[in-house]
Amino acid sequence: NAIYTNKMAKTIIKYIKYIKGGLDVRRKFKLVALTTAMVMTAAAVMGCGSQSGDGGTAAPEEKNTENNVESSVESGSEESGEVDVFARYDEPVEISSVKNLGAGMQFPEGDSLEDNVWTRYYEEALNIKVNWVWSTNTEQYAQKVNIAITSDDIPDVMQVNASQLKMMYDNGQIMDVTEVAEANLAPFTKEVLNSDGGLAMQAATFDGRLYAIPKIGSPLMTAKVLWVRTDWLDNLGLELPETVEDMRNIAEAFTTQDPDGNGVDDTYGLAVYKDLYGSGYADLTGFFNAYNAYPGIWVDKGDEVVWGGIQPEVKDAMAALHEMYAAGQIDPEFGVKDANKVNEDVSAGRCGMMFGDFWNMAWINDAKIKDPSFEWVPVAIPSLDGTTPAKAQLSASTVDFYVISADCEHPEAVIKMLNLQLEKSYGETAEPEVYNITPEGFGTYQYPVVSIEPPMKNFTAAQKVTAVINGEADPDTLNDEERGYYEMACKSLDGDHKDNNWHQLKMYGPGGALGVIYDNYWVSGNVVNDAYYAAPTEAMAEMLPTLKKQQLQDYTNIILEGDLDKFDSFVANWNQLG
């Protein structure tokens, strides 16, 4: 931005930002090479809106914009102690947003995105009305956000990825929320946002100022497991896989030995979706990890941090995937099937293994209801050599962020909604059976405008639920949310799989995915963390989306064609451009 090449302009802009309470005025001047005189004129005009009572312009003391935002938000201030962070507005406040309709989002009869338990509670508790500008599925969401950014059609608050955050910061489209956050975040919200030692807050910080609220989560929740159809294993007299060789032998057997016993050649071994990784369902991240490859994160090699997607171990995994594809162990049409289409195959009994997230059984719970013999079990990522356990790659604690538009009239309302979501879902006054997951299995946790969660709470819940089911603890040790999981898991154990009961058992019960992840990766330290956790650099924001797209295209072509020289060409191109 040419305006920042002028030292006087930079000083004036900082001054205007201060007297306007943090409004990012770069938006008024973005991508225009202004002279010092033009900037001074603009400063004078904007200064008229911040006059003192006697008609003079306020002259505040210059602020230090290099303050560490983590410490300010974590500790708060004397003024923040005087703010009722749950106070209801006297007059209605409207907040506009957009929605990523996540996997399996459903509403009780009569409810909708516009009218549900959370939108009603916003109005009841805070007098805030939510206006959804648009909504779309996960696969289209990033594209629609890009269009909104390009057209400058920004709602009051929306969820963005790291590259989009950097783009909007550079464009001056988002608000500096340092003071708003400091004054309005509830203590519990501050605690959760800083639960990773401040890394998430650092990723949302530019030049010492906070420009987004990180959608903090648990990196461990991004670890993958291998889901296997154990009824097919039983039919063929096979054991659960422990090594890569075991996995590949099972894939061959599931493809060639009629595991469903219907006498028809209609099954294959490993489910894969068209984008290979990123969906969490039929996601090859775990397959790559089995080969000690980590294609979607930055990896610490000791003396340098490198992109995992161009390391030599990836080539070995690609060779194996092509062999499996050529042998019919992977759907020949995987390249055109999104996760929903792959799920149709899995639910219809055409596939027997897939790598994915802990929640994957949510998508096929209905298939379990129709056929109780339909049984899947999660196992840890197989070991390559049978001796050294595989390490699961973990994303950063924050990969998405909530940004507030520079034009938002009530930025504190967004913070209030976040406080409310966290408190009613996980705080001392939580009602998880209403605001998290209902007894009927509706995931109301998907409905809020903004939401975060304590990073380890699901793993704690799984340990406690499993202990009670195993008779090692009393049900009275469970909180309301955990009791809900326990009751649903018990129903599934008794043969009642409806209302997502089986899905809850497969997450929280004995042998469930959360326990597999915690015991095999976390306790033993078998993880590879994303080594980059700051806000994206200018080069990252500009080049990484294009390079990632090229990576996906080249990986897919290699699986289909088996030309491993393309990987070497891809690496050379990456190093040249990146």
Label each residue range with its predicted role.
Residues Y4-N6, T11-K20, K28, L34, ...:
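Conserved N-terminal structural module of periplasmic/extracytoplasmic solute-binding proteins
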Residues V32-M40:
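Sec-dependent N-terminal signal peptides
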Residues A43-G47:
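C-terminal motif of bacterial Sec signal peptides marking the signal peptidase cleavage site
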Residues L101-V117, L220-W227, D234-L240, K274-A327, ...:
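Extracytoplasmic/periplasmic substrate-binding proteins
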Residues K129-S135, E333, V377-V379:
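General small-molecule cofactor/ligand-binding pocket signal
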Residues P155-Q159, G352-D357:
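Paired acidic/hydrophobic, glycine-rich loop segments that form the ligand-binding mouth/hinge
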Residues T205-S279, V299-D345, R350, Y402-P439, ...:
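Helix-loop-helix "hinge/cap" segment bordering the ligand-binding cleft or interdomain interface
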Residues K424-D554:
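Conserved small-residue motifs centered on glycine
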